[in-house]
UniProtKB/Swiss-Prot annotation:
It is found in: Cytoplasm. GO terms for cellular component: cytoplasm. Disulfide bonds: none annotated. Catalyzes the ferrous insertion into protoporphyrin IX. This is Ferrochelatase. Its EC number is 4.98.1.1. Fe cation binds at residues 197, 278. One of its GO terms (molecular function) is ferrochelatase activity. GO terms for biological process: heme biosynthetic process. HAMAP family: Ferrochelatase. It comes from the Bacteria.
């Protein structure tokens, strides 16, 4: 008899081929959790503009790592390894992969889950730390699918919002860092550089996103498990657009450390569990070049966990614990910890209020975007007036 238990692994997704880059970017920037705008109707046109203008540069970046993202292949390896690990602890389960912005899409995974008549489902994001722009975006999509489909509502599901503090995950990260440190000429002199994917600062300060808090706690846990004397720093990478993101920024800290005389860096991709463009290209190529030009002599990067045995065992334990615990629902997890209005704003607000200030910021962003479009296109009201 086929198993009626399923595990749905959630991830971002990535383009498999150069021709997939533009539609992937369009899907990414169409998500209001990625770029928040005051009016829904602006989302698709802006996504089209950004994906079209960025496609060529992004394709060049992907060309540096073979033309496409390895994320799907690695996630499939993780799913197979997790299925075997679950069988090893007596749990028969079907594994499904749901990517947010590229194939196999979350909707495709849900269709297969229904076809397989799954009755118990663990939803496990492959993001150790929760953010409204990663796990939160996928959870909101799933919640919408559940609300629209009576068949899905028959499934007993549970969410694992984050697992940055799971002992097995922490131990696996410490193990990989230890191995990389020991490859350095002078291991104790290396600075351990944790680089996390950034998010706009407003996600944390306005929307109550726990991401920064969980990242910082995760670093403390890993350093305690590592138990080495090395200095360490935390910075944030992959900033996009004109708004302020979490700081300090990775490239700035690299330059600061080099100016202080640091010669050896061991970079840890703290928010990534699989190799993809932000580890293979952004860290391994861009940041390595910045470090070398600044005088860093040894630049080593800790590999992503991928299908590391300890990591897969930790995922299996997470699933086991989730099946035994009371279920966690979308309504529970998607509720912001702060009482502020999340996207989309339902009405305009005037005055010196936090809501009015958010509108001011959004209008400023729209003005900036309009200026960028005019600068790129060479057409618009400022050109007509002779101001550009």
């Amino acid at each position: 008899m086929a198993s009626q238990t399923g595990v749905l692994l959630l991830n971002l997704g990535g383009p498999d081929r150069p021709e997939d880059v533009r539609p992937f970017l369009y899907n990414l920037f169409s998500d209001p959790e990625i770029i928040r705008l005051p009016f829904r109707w602006l989302q698709k046109p802006l996504a089209w503009f950004i994906s079209t203008s960025r496609a060529r540069r992004s394709q060049a970046n992907y060309a540096q790592i073979g033309g496409g993202s390895p994320l799907r292949r690695i996630t499939e390896q993780q799913a197979r390894a997790l299925k075997d690990a679950l069988e090893g602890i007596g749990i028969e389960a079907n594994l499904y992969i749901g990517m947010r912005y590229w194939h196999p899409f979350t909707e495709e995974a849900i269709a297969q889950i229904k076809a397989d008549q799954i009755r118990e489902l663990v939803i496990l994001p492959l993001y150790p730390q929760f953010s409204i722009s990663t796990s939160g975006s996928s959870f909101r999509l799933l919640e919408s699918l559940w609300n629209q489909d009576p068949e899905l509502q028959k499934i007993r599901y549970t969410l694992i919002p984050s697992w940055y503090n799971h002992p097995g995950y922490v131990a696996a990260m410490a193990d990989l860092i230890r191995q990389e440190l020991d490859r350095c000429p002078n291991p104790d002199e290396a600075v351990i550089f944790f680089s996390a994917h950034g998010v706009p600062k407003s996600y944390v300060t306005e929307a109550g996103d726990p991401y920064q808090e969980e990242i910082e706690a995760c670093v403390r846990l890993i350093m305690a498990a590592l138990n080495r004397p090395n200095a360490h720093v935390l910075a944030y990478q992959s900033r996009v657009g004109p708004v302020e993101w979490l700081q300090p920024y990775t490239e700035d800290v690299i330059l600061e450390l080099a100016a202080q005389g640091v010669k050896t860096l061991v970079v840890v991709p703290i928010s990534f569990v699989s190799e993809h463009i932000e580890t293979l290209q952004e860290i391994d190529i861009e940041y390595r070049e910045i470090a070398a030009e600044a005088g860093i002599e040894v630049f080593r990067r800790v590999p992503a966990l991928n299908d590391h045995n300890g990591f897969i065992s930790a995922l299996a334990q997470l699933v086991k614990e989730a099946l035994a615990a009371p279920p966690r629902t979308f309504a529970e997890v998607n509720q912001s910890r702060k009482r502020v209005k999340l996207y989309p704003q339902e009405r305009w607000e005037w005055g010196m209020t936090s809501a009015a200030e958010r509108w001011n910021g959004r209008l400023a962003m729209l003005g900036f975007l309009a200026l960028m479009i005019e600068l790129i296109s060479g057409q618009g009201p400022l050109h007509m007036l002779g101001l550009l």
